[in-house]
Amino acid sequence: MARVKRGVVARRRHKKVLKAAKGYYGARSRVFRVAKQAVIKAGQYAYRDRRVKKRNFRALWITRINAQSRAEGLSYSRLIAGLKKASIALDRRVLADLAIHDKTAFAAIVAKAQEALAA
């Protein structure tokens, strides 16, 4: 049986990993063994942080909504309860956008929520 020389395959694999590690600091971008670990770890961070990003944005939206709704005289939790009671189905991303860019529309929504809570 013929001997298998894997020079081409190994070179291709090494090039792929080193290309993925381009821009990393020091040996992480030059030494295959270290670069391979760095690329794997970067992939783990990317996977985790794609999920964390969703949590962070939701927290940011809630903070923005709370700040603006308190300026209108209603806490965040009361606002959300009022919106549910008034069956206004706006998600937090849209509410946060309105709170920042269209304060009059947001004030109208808060007023609707207050009416629903009073009823």
From Swiss-Prot:
Binds directly to 23S ribosomal RNA and is necessary for the in vitro assembly process of the 50S ribosomal subunit. It is not involved in the protein synthesizing functions of that subunit. The lineage of its organism: Bacteria, Pseudomonadati, Pseudomonadota, Gammaproteobacteria, Cellvibrionales. The gene is rplT. This is Large ribosomal subunit protein bL20. InterPro entries: Ribosomal_bL20, RIBOSOMAL_L20_CS, Ribosomal_protein_bL20_C. The keyword rRNA-binding applies. Signal peptide: none annotated. It comes from Saccharophagus degradans (strain 2-40 / ATCC 43961 / DSM 17024). Belongs to the bacterial ribosomal protein bL20 family. One of its GO terms (molecular function) is structural constituent of ribosome. Keywords: Ribonucleoprotein, Ribosomal protein, RNA-binding, rRNA-binding. SUPFAM superfamilies: Ribosomal protein L20 (SSF74731). One of its GO terms (cellular component) is ribosome. Gene3D superfamilies: 6.10.160.10, Ribosomal protein L20. GO terms for biological process: ribosomal large subunit assembly; translation. Transmembrane segments: none annotated.
